[in-house]
Amino acid sequence: RGALRQGVIFDLDERLQATALQQDGHDIRDASVRELQRRFIVDISQAKRVSGVAEHLYALVEPDATPEARRELLWASALHEMGMMVSHHDHHRHSAYLLGHVDAPGFSQRQQRRMADLIQVQRGGLRKLDLGLANPQFAWQALCLRLAVIKCHARGAIDTRALQIKRDNDKALLVFGPAWAENNPRTLHLLREEAEAWSRQGS
């Protein structure tokens, strides 16, 4: 009960903080994200592509998500490659570490940790964040970010709506046309691997 109460208090505090941050029509956290992108030389074009796909997919599976949940996913998408400045190898781990420890005005430590966890699970195995994935909101955010990263892996122009997703309770069904699949064999292969990863996870 104590942990639950603490979680509710943290959540309420973050909601109040977010409201205060946005009262003048601007959110200092947006400026913090832009500064981190500049500081860590993030590929802005790729960040926008991934953010666009992640936002589109998340709206389909979580239409009633809170504005904060949507924004957290977009911020994580915007910063998912910040660790490439350290190394291209395992950059998701470097990105997660940096976001979890960097000074980012406007963000609570708890919110930074959630976003760092999202970034860490953008690729690779899912077991590293079993506890986080037990939270449905986090699991759907993670799925949408991972799918967006896969969809944008070629780092070129994309059709955001070429890949659709349908939700059935806790299950997800990917929908795409045969022409798109034929023209994107590498992406199709990665999507099949992704489906297998979630299947092994029991999702």
What positions do the PLM features span?
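Phosphate-binding glycine-rich/basic clefts of nucleotide- and phosphate-handling proteins
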Residues: 1-17
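Conserved active-site and cofactor/substrate-binding residues in soluble primary-metabolism enzymes
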Residues: 3, 28, 45
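Short conserved micro-motifs at the rims of enzyme active sites and ligand-binding pockets
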Residues: 9-11, 130-131, 185-188
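Long, charged amphipathic helices and adjacent flexible linkers at domain junctions
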Residues: 18-39
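Divalent metal-dependent catalytic cores for phosphoryl transfer on phosphate-bearing substrates
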Residues: 34-37, 46, 51-167
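Loop/helix patches that line or flank the sugar-binding groove of alpha-linked glycan CAZymes
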Residues: 42
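Low-complexity, glycine/alanine/valine/leucine- and proline-rich hydrophobic stretches
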Residues: 154-203
